[in-house]
């Protein structure tokens, strides 16, 4: 088997850094989990874009007469939360769907609930926290309407992010409970060390993908539309 080369994030060649992770949805994720995994990846991308737009909103806030603290914090949140959210909650759910690991599911639930709380706080928008939320935006309309309109864009995006995060958390939790997952199972994986054993992870991945392929390729019994009667020659 060819060695997997890290391919994420895809960095330009002029940057003297190499990708840190290997990511291939079609190769790693079983078909029945592919759609949900990609949706969570798109949610991470939305979060990253929202943080970038928030930086623009805080710049408009600064130009309109707001303090420089918000712009500085917005820049900090962008460079901090973008990689941290990928490592802390997307990689665990990617690994959870890849290897059917209860420990990875629990790691996702713990960190993603924190992400949900952060998204709600960002949508609220407490002044001085480096986010263009509802409180900060509405209160700034009396100072500069133009800046407030620009600030309204990341405010709406933070709100959408919070709603989508709640929906995503509910969907993953419903799937996990429906598949028989539990906290005790995650604790068992932690105790036995199965969550970090590459051989166990590979076996779980192969079993999950094999079951999915078997379900799709299972032949269906064909029945003839014409009845076939067998008569005995004995009277």
Curated annotation (Swiss-Prot):
Required for the calcium-dependent exocytosis of signal sequence-containing cytokines such as CCL5. Probably acts in cooperation with the SNARE machinery. The keyword Cell membrane applies. The gene is SCAMP5. Residues 1-39, 89-102, 170-235 are cytoplasmic. It is a multi-pass membrane protein. Belongs to the SCAMP family. SCAMP5 subfamily. GO terms for biological process: exocytosis; positive regulation of calcium ion-dependent exocytosis; positive regulation of cytokine production; protein transport. This is Secretory carrier-associated membrane protein 5. GO terms for cellular component: Golgi membrane; plasma membrane; recycling endosome membrane; synaptic vesicle membrane; trans-Golgi network membrane. It comes from the Eukaryota. The chain crosses the membrane at residues 40-60, 68-88, 103-125, 149-169.
């Amino acid at each position: 088997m060819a060695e997997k080369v890290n391919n994420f994030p895809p960095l330009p060649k002029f940057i003297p850094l190499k990708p840190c992770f290997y990511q291939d949805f079609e190769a790693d994720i079983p078909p029945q989990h592919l759609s949900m995994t990609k949706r969570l990846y798109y949610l991470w991308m939305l979060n990253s874009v929202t943080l970038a737009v928030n930086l623009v909103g805080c710049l408009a806030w600064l130009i309109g007469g707001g303090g420089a603290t918000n712009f500085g914090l917005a820049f900090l949140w962008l460079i901090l939360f973008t990689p941290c959210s990928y490592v802390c909650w997307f990689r665990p759910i990617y690994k959870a769907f890849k290897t059917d690991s209860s420990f990875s599911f629990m790691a996702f639930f713990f960190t993603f609930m924190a992400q949900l709380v952060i998204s709600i706080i960002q949508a609220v928008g407490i002044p001085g926290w480096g986010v263009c939320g509802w409180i900060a935006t509405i209160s700034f309309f009396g100072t500069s309407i133009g800046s407030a309109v620009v600030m309204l864009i990341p405010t709406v995006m933070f709100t959408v992010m919070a709603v989508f995060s709640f929906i995503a958390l509910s969907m993953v939790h419903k799937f996990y409970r429906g598949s028989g997952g539990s906290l005790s199972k995650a604790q068992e994986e932690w105790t036995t060390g199965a969550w970090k054993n590459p051989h166990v992870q590979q076996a779980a991945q192969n079993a999950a993908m094999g079951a999915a392929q078997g379900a799709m390729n299972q032949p269906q019994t064909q029945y003839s539309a014409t009845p076939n009667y067998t008569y005995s020659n004995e009277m």
